[in-house]
Design a protein with these regions (language model features):
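Conserved anion-binding
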Residues: 1-16, 85, 89-169
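N-terminal beta-alpha supersecondary unit
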Residues: 5-51
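Short, acidic/polar
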Residues: 19-31, 76-82, 142-152, 204
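Conserved, mostly hydrophobic/aromatic
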Residues: 30, 38, 84, 119, ...
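Glycine-rich, proline-tolerant flexible connector loops at the mouths of alpha/beta enzymes
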Residues: 37-56, 96, 163-173
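Charged helix-capping and loop-helix junction motifs
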Residues: 51-58, 141-147, 173-181
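Catalytic cores of alpha/beta
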Residues: 62-92, 103, 178-217
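C-terminal helical cap(s) of enzyme catalytic domains, especially alpha/beta-barrels
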Residues: 104-112, 204-238
Length: 238
């Protein structure tokens, strides 16, 4: 956000922690440990669609051409999607468009290919335990369920789905293992990316056991809560 490396607590822009002025330093640290993929979120873009961090993303893509970068936040038009992929970004993450403009998102899947598109569904559990979708930087909640959303895209070749339990994001409270276990059970052909709540190496082991293909961790890594010896075995795979 604003060119800095930051984390929000549960998607709240008034609960921001700054971890550094140069995201490249942090990305380099992960690359040197053996990370094949790095997940980057343009929080300004996620909030209002602005592209003020585009230059920073371009620098990361150039400087770390040997590391695949997936970028989300504010990818709300075909023009922005194509420009990001043109910068050397390996995958783009689409959230609000996937929820509110499914026809547009399906066109991107067909045009850019399912391996270049990650469908991001940020969820809050309702009183009955059903994961309901949120949009626009987690500030708007819908009545649509995660399961219905994935069903919409599966016939169109969707391959990668990133699911974040918003209530756990940045809280170091442990991931929602039941959510990802159920996601893999319902849609075993989807490459699920689990996000939210990771706090230690044991969480990575537990998430791997759910069948999730990848795990996204922010705060736990930025605060060095996962020792390198526990982290490195997972990096070549996700």
């Amino acid at each position: 956000r604003g060119g800095q490396c930051v984390r929000l607590l549960q998607g709240r822009f008034d609960a921001e922690t700054v971890y550094g002025n140069d995201p490249g330093v942090i990305l380099g640290r992960y690359r040197d440990l053996g990370a094949r993929y790095v997940h980057v979120v343009d929080l300004d873009g996620a909030r209002d669609g602005s592209q003020g961090n585009r230059a920073a993303i371009a620098r990361l893509a150039r400087a770390f051409a040997d590391t695949a970068i997936q970028v989300g936040g504010g990818v709300r038009s075909r023009k922005v999607a194509a420009e990001l992929l043109g910068l050397g970004v390996q995958r783009i993450v689409i959230g609000s468009v996937a929820v509110t403009q499914p026809a547009e998102a399906r066109q991107w899947l067909e045009e850019f290919g399912p391996d270049r598109i990650v469908l991001a569904f940020d969820v809050r559990l309702d009183a009955g335990g059903t994961p309901r979708l949120t949009t626009h930087g987690w500030e708007s909640q819908t009545e649509a369920s995660l399961w219905d959303a994935v069903l919409t895209y599966q016939p169109h070749g969707a391959m990668h789905v990133l699911c974040t339990d918003v209530a756990r994001d940045g809280a170091l409270s442990g991931p929602n293992l039941a959510l990802y276990t159920e996601a893999v059970r319902r849609f075993p052909k989807i490459q699920w990316q689990a996000s939210g709540g990771v706090s230690c190496g044991a969480d990575l082991v537990a998430l791997a056991a759910t069948g999730a293909a990848a795990v996204i961790s922010g705060r736990a890594l930025l605060e060095n809560r996962i020792p390198a010896a526990e982290l490195v075995p997972f990096l070549p795979n996700a």
